[in-house]
């Protein structure tokens, strides 16, 4: 199974605005889980938190297209191929594609003790639309 063997991410569709695709690259029951996640234009996941008693968190390796990453209380960060995002456990955040671009990243779940994911509210259309205005003013 390579990066091109993707399928519709139906199990998690309730946590996404728009259409996304999910391709596990490793066995989720093993020590480190990697998956290729592809977002259609304007698709994004809900705010969420990766919890862990110790360790945990997530790494995003940006592969193709243009995306967004935002932590609660901070400005959104534009993502480009080759960018790496380190997300510590306990940080509320979201990520997804820019308005007119597909976006793909490799998501790596960092090993930890008592890890879990908490899915929260969607990123609203108004919040998302404001990103383009911010990006246009601050390229």
Task: Please place each PLM-identified region on the residue numbering.
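Short, small-residue-biased leader/transition segments that mark boundaries at the very start
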Residues: 2-7
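A short glycine-rich, His/Asp/Glu-containing loop-to-beta-strand
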Residues: 8-49, 53-56
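Acidic/histidine-enriched, glycine/proline-rich intrinsically disordered or flexible terminal extensions
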Residues: 114-139
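Conserved metal-binding segment of the jelly-roll/cupin
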Residues: 39-42, 79-100
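Short strand-connecting beta-turns/loops that link adjacent beta-strands
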Residues: 30, 54, 74, 100-101, ...
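Conserved hydrophobic/aromatic beta-strand scaffold that supports enzyme active sites
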Residues: 22-24, 34-38, 59, 76, ...
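A short beta-strand-loop-beta hairpin characteristic of the jelly-roll/cupin
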Residues: 44, 54-81, 91
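Ligand-binding loop in jelly-roll beta-barrel domains
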Residues: 68, 89-117
């Amino acid at each position: 199974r390579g990066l091109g063997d993707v399928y519709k991410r139906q199990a998690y569709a309730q946590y996404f605005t728009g259409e996304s695709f999910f391709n596990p690259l490793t066995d989720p029951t093993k020590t480190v889980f990697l998956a290729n996640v592809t977002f259609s234009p304007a698709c994004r996941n809900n705010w969420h938190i990766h919890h862990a008693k110790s360790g945990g968190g997530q790494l995003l390796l940006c592969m193709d297209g243009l995306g967004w990453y935002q932590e609660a209380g901070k400005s959104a960060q534009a993502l480009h191929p080759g960018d790496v995002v380190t997300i510590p456990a306990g940080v509320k955040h979201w990520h997804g594609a820019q308005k007119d671009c597909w976006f793909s990243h490799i998501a790596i779940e960092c090993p930890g003790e008592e890890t879990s994911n908490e899915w929260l509210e969607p990123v609203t259309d108004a919040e998302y639309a404001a990103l383009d205005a911010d990006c246009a003013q601050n390229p």
